[in-house]
Amino acid sequence: MSYDMDITKTPPAHEPERQYYYMAKAKDFVEKKSKEIGRPMTYFVKTFGCQMNARDSEKLVGILEQIGYVEGTDEHSDFIVYNTCTVRENANNKVYGRLGYLQNYKKKNPLMKIALCGCMMQEPEVVENIKKHYKFVDIVFGTHNIFKFAEILCNNIESGSQVIDIWKDTNQIVEDLPVKRKFSFKSGVNIMFGCNNFCSYCIVPYVRGRERSREPKDIIREIEKLVADGVCEIMLLGQNVNSYGKTLDNPITFAELLREVNKIKGLKRIRFMTSHPKDLSEDLIMAIKECDKVCKHMHLPLQSGSSRVLKEMNRHYDKEKYLDEVKRLREQIPDIAITTDIIVGFPGETEEDFLETMDVVKQVRYDSAFTFIYSKRTGTRAATMENQVPDDVVKDRFDRLLKEVQTISSEKAKCYEGKVVPVLAEEMDDQKDGYVTGRMDNNSIVHFPGTEDMIGNIYNVKLDECRGFYYMGEIKEDA
């Protein structure tokens, strides 16, 4: 897409042409300001939350760099963007805490612009709070119109006042906008947006909107471009990738998409997340088994092992169905790594319910698990439930669960000692000079001797020693 657009004319009506018009307009502003101050204008993007947010931030950075900003090192930069998360209350508090510092920085730098975007901004009470107490924030937008970032910025530049642009929902997907990847050798790729599951504790459907899938041809085209640019590993992203394709005019399944992506020449690894247990089909299991580029790792959120609690959570499966799915996975792919999410302290959770969760943990023997204390989110059904579990009881259960998960994870990790496995070198080890940090097919971390020029390549590494949740190893030969 060309940036040679006449910004004196009326902006185009269609996307993405309209956004390229506003990028050109914003670039004109940035170039003039840079000349005035005698240096490039800088940006700093802080990402809170999940892989979806991380990918959104790469899009924001792509737009910022296209309009002339250069990357700064911290929050003293000229343009600060907080891409926020609201899955747990603590995430909101982190943002509010940092805004206080930004206000002081802005007093010292009148050119500074502050933008807040992401899931937290989809909550009406948050936006009202910002309007009342954080008037120094320049731009506020949500999850549905990130593609309009340049246009919203231009509105702020022209008006000189706070611009708030929040969409309640959308079915729009805008392709072909700039993206600046964090890593040269791996990339996330959105295959869908939104969620239709409405788990009773979860705010995601309210802030990310209804489920909508990208066209497979657009996904394949994006991955082919990434591979041509040196990417060897991609992560297919969605709130529930297992339900991919249902909203398309010509529906296809996630298993079918995996098989198509697996055919792309030059691509070496395919990961995906997140999978909802209710949509785990036999066809998907077979696709994971048969596609040689698909990593043998499944993140399968349990949330609770109690069928009663799962019903209250609106998860659409019970303990027996979940265990059956794990059994089917391991029958077809014996060496698959299974990881999970577990919530402790959901309203009404009894000791018996908790012990059901512990039972699933002991039966499944997860490679690792993300364990969370239930966080009440305004607007969800669970927030109004009675029988909130006392904090001391929740903490006791959380500690017991964490101990069990860590014990099992450590035991499972020990089984790989002495084996030679392919490892993708990802970055220099920040704890040990002369070592690189890489990742196995099953997502485990390995540290081994290496240099910076090895990053982005896959090596066969002998796992000499397991140190809890990571390995020390040495290269045997190129993979």
Predicted features by range, described:
Residues 50, 245-266, 313-316, 376-407:
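Radical SAM enzyme [4Fe-4S]-AdoMet core and its adjacent flexible, acidic
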Residues 113-116, 123-125, 228-351, 362:
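Conserved SAM/AdoMet-binding glycine-rich loop
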Residues 182-185, 195-197, 294, 304, ...:
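Short flexible coil/turn linkers enriched for glycine and charged/polar residues
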Residues 238, 274, 302-304, 340-344, ...:
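Active-site proximal loops enriched in glycine and acidic residues that flank catalytic Cys/His/Asp
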Residues 1, 384-479:
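Terminal RNA-binding accessory module
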Residues 199, 219, 236, 272, ...:
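Conserved, mostly hydrophobic/aromatic
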Residues 147, 197, 242, 278, ...:
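Glycine-centered loop/turn positions within well-structured domains
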Residues 2-244, 283, 298, 320-327, ...:
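Proteins enriched for Cys/Gly/acidic motifs involved in redox and nucleic-acid/cofactor modification
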